[in-house]
Regions:
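Donor/substrate-binding cores of folate-linked one-carbon enzymes
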Residues: 22, 32, 81-175
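A structural microfeature
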Residues: 28, 61, 148-149
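Short beta->alpha connector loops
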Residues: 8-11, 63-66, 87-89
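N-terminal glycine-/serine-/threonine-rich beta1-alpha1-beta2 phosphate-ribose binding loop
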Residues: 36-78
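N-terminal Rossmann-like dinucleotide-binding module
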Residues: 1-40
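Short active-site oxyanion
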Residues: 1-4, 78-82
Length: 175
C-alpha cells in the first residue's frame, strides 16, 4: 500500500519501521522541523527523520499545514493512506481527507481515556494498572475518530513513563 507517514519522536519510529518491514511503499515522511539542541544550538533531527533517512525515505518538514502548500504536496504524493503517530501538530481536515482511504492514528492510550497530549504520563501519574494503544480513523475532533483496533497492556507499579513509552511504541506498531 502507498502510505504517507507522519511522526516525530521515538514513539513514532516503531510504527514507521514496521510499515517499512512489511513492505509498504512509503511515499513520504512528514516530521517536525529540526530544532536547536544543547548549548551550541546545533540543529537536531527528529528520531523519525533519522530513521527515515537511514532507510532512504524522502522526508518533508513543513512549517505550515494550513496554507495549502502541504495539502498540494500530499496530493502530489498521492498516498492511499496516511499513518500518523505522534506527529506533534493538529492536522487540518483537508489533509486528513486527502488520501483515498483517509488517515489513521496510533494513539498511546485506550481511547476515549486520555484523549489529547501526554496520555502515557497521565496513565503513570494516575497510577493506572492498565493502558494500551488505540488505532483509529482521524476526524476533525482530536482523538475522536472511529476506533479500528486497540490493545492493552498492564503497567508495572515501578514502571516510568519512558519505559512505558517504549513498550507502547512497539505495541502500537504491532496492532
Amino acid at each position: 500500500m502507498r502510505i504517507l507517514f507522519m511522526g516525530t519522536p521515538d514513539f513514532a519510529v516503531a510504527s514507521l519501521r514496521r510499515l517499512v518491514e512489511d513492505g509498504h511503499e512509503i511515499c513520504g515522511v512528514f516530521t517536525q522541523p529540526d530544532k536547536p539542541k544543547n548549548r551550541g544550538h546545533k540543529l537536531a533531527f527528529s528520531p523519525v527523520k533519522e530513521y527515515a533517512l537511514s532507510q532512504g525515505l524522502t522526508v518533508y518538514q513543513p512549517t505550515k499545514l494550513r496554507d495549502g502548500t502541504a495539502l498540494e504536496l500530499i496530493r502530489t504524493l498521492a498516498p492511499e493512506l496516511t499513518v500518523v503517530a505522534a506527529y506533534g501538530r493538529i492536522l487540518p481536515e483537508d489533509i486528513l481527507a486527502a488520501p483515498k482511504l483517509g488517515s489513521i492514528n496510533v494513539h498511546s492510550s485506550l481511547l476515549p481515556k486520555y484523549r489529547g497530549a501526554a496520555p502515557i504520563n497521565w496513565a503513570v501519574l494516575n497510577g493506572d494498572a492498565v493502558t494500551g494503544v488505540t488505532i483509529m480513523y482521524m476526524a476533525k475532533e482530536l482523538d475522536a475518530g472511529d476506533i479500528i483496533s486497540a490493545a492493552e497492556t498492564p503497567i508495572d507499579p515501578d514502571e516510568d513513563a519512558l519505559t512505558l513509552t517504549n513498550r507502547l511504541a512497539e505495541l502500537g506498531a504491532e496492532t
